[in-house]
Amino acid sequence: MRPTGCSLRGRSLKKERKVFKELLPPDEAMRRLEERVPPTPPEAEEVPIEEALGFYLAEDVKSPINLPPYPRSAADGYAVRARSTWGASEDEPVELRVVGEVRVGEAPGFELKEGEAAEVDTGSALPPGADAVVMIEYVKEVGDKILVYKSVVPGENVLWPATDVYSGQPLWKRGTRVDSRVIASLASVGIRKVRVWRPKVYLISTGSELVEPGKPLETGKIYDVNTYSLQARLREEGFVPIVHGVVPDDKEEIKKAILEGVEKADVVVTTGSTSAGPADFVYRAVGEVGEVLVHGLAFKPGKPVMLGVVKGKPVFGLAGHPDSAYFNLERLVIPYLRKMVKADERSQSSTKAVAATSFVGAKGRRTHVPVSLLTDGSRWFAFPASHSDHAMVSYSKADGYIVIPETRRAPVEPGEEVEVWLFKDPSYKGAIVGDTDVAVDAVVERLDYPPKMLPLGSYSGAYASKMSLRSVWISPEAVGKEVEVEVVAVGRGERVGVPHKSSFLYPFFSKFLEVEGISREELQKRFVRVTMPTPQALASAVASGEVDAAITTRNAAEALGLDWRPLSKAKLYIGWTEDHAELGREVLNEFLRRGG
């Protein structure tokens, strides 16, 4: 007699049992799949930015405006012409006449003259003529006048146009995963909708023994875990699971489910029924409606994994045990999906880094400083994410932040170890650090991956060169290939765009004044000075009318159709580490092609 519970199925199907003849390394298995079914992006969908959360940008995004779009107050107080306050002190305050006020959301309806002041709030637009803001705590109001007890310099407590981002500046590369910081930056520049990729994954759990969680569990049955764990993991990564549910161990039912899946989704994932036993039907089903490319991998867990193609869509047959299925999804399916959308790396919590420059905290306050990280292969090095404390877009692209305690009086010094709390995984495929020009923008636009950009000026480029940080560096002080960039003047007028002290353009500002016939004394008395971080920002500010004149590069001027006047030639050196040779040569050739 046959024991109760046994079946003759094993005997009748014994001839169908398959033996794994070739166990491939995972990399080789995926190479075969990707050669047969390249991981190309799905059709893009346009969605409101609030619905884009978690998905992947399907195209590069540029800023349509300068940010800030107009001069704004960074403090509550009074807008003034800075020179009107010079000489002010606690003992001898300067008296100014209050001629109006500008509230947040209002457009100034008057021009500020010397000896005058206008009350402003944090975020208010500055009236024409104003170039600084005296904080309210340094002012005493006396009727229609104020007494100023502390002098200010041009630009103090002012957010100038394009100091965060300039019109046309690349913000995010396609393939960037949309998170709350990306949405904040998009809203900051007025973008309402974006095109995203949302790859759909069809999930099929196979096994006559599987029961939906929540239902009574009979002897011989187990709960279906894979349907729930895998769809959750896919959602965590920004992919869209379509759940078919449980299919019994029946070849025809499995075939039907797979054929339905390739019609509804971009990728099909099955779990269970992939081994070599007589009741393992997935590879047989795929073989009948498509092609089995790989069956059996040389890693654990994952030996019975099957990779195939049906009607041009990839089919992943994963092991049925929940731990194995999850591991297989993580190691095989998710990397394939990330390639489809050119995804960013996943996040970490914190890491140690070396301060690449000094970081100064606010006295008596715990200070969080956004940073970008580069590596020499063994250590991370922390750079400031921006020159400005009010740069939302730059902040949103930071890798993380360091915390300077409120009790610390001394700055964080270069070379000091810091703890970086991460917004995301700081790993990168490519990075460009130091000085910049539109030649760099042109190269970035051609790349099919999002490089890490640190346009922080000459010091950062020289530091990356000195420390051999994995990157392409650009600086007049670095080691590398020499290129010449033509420095030019654009526009004329009393509102002057000044390069940041970290920029390679800054040493040429004296030449700009000489050619324009402006003395240092006149500059102090007559001109409004607006500091900008890059040649592109300076040119953009002139093109948009935010400043009247500026020093920039010929490339930046011509990119915006500006007339320019020659000033001088700047020498820059472009170098790179070996792993950045291809990107470095592309940047170098773009500078040479543009010829200054």
Predicted features along the sequence, with ranges:
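Helix-rich terminal scaffold detector
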Residues: 2-27, 192-318, 322-328, 332
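Short, glycine/charged-enriched hinge/interface segments at domain edges or termini
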Residues: 14, 20-26, 79-245, 259, ...
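Flexible glycine/proline-rich
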Residues: 23, 27-30, 40, 45-50, ...
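Short loop->beta-strand "edge-of-pocket" segments that line small-molecule binding or catalytic clefts
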Residues: 432-434, 490-513
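Short helix-initiation/N-cap motifs at beta->coil->alpha
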Residues: 436, 448-461, 524-540
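N-terminal segment of the mature folded domain
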Residues: 438-492, 575
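A ligand-binding cleft/hinge motif common to bilobed small-molecule-binding domains
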Residues: 460-472, 540-565
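Periplasmic-binding protein-like
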Residues: 480, 484, 561-589
